[in-house]
């Protein structure tokens, strides 16, 4: 696949390296040339300096042949504009956008964005969305820590995340709702069929 990544922070650099190692053609765009140091010496993709909504720069990046674009800068406004340019101007088939402010979720949804929030696990989620067309929902376990996928039934619907954390003695780090993933506030009220990603210690 030919993939453009806009933003070379922690998520962007991790995503770029992961996709590049799997054999995909990767172009990374960032306004700060120093950000490319995060990619390391083994990155064999292309880097371009500039913003992700500059049409000429995007054409130089090869957006007209891109299979997917991941927009992962550190600003929601920049991400929205860059996403709309990729989708509306260049008709990129897959565009995945990072979200920081969960309060904007409804706006992002109305714009038709594929939004993902958070930090560490986000790059892997974006990679799965780009390469396989869906978000990962797998259980995993590392040492004493395990990640649990927990589906909300009607008995738990209406509770806040804080109340559920107390019940389960675990840490909720993401909520999947209508195939969108974001990092919510603890006072968020869950709905039936929400899926929680929970970090828990092995007992």
State where each predicted segment sits:
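Cytosolic regulatory regions of ion transport systems
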Residues: 1-203
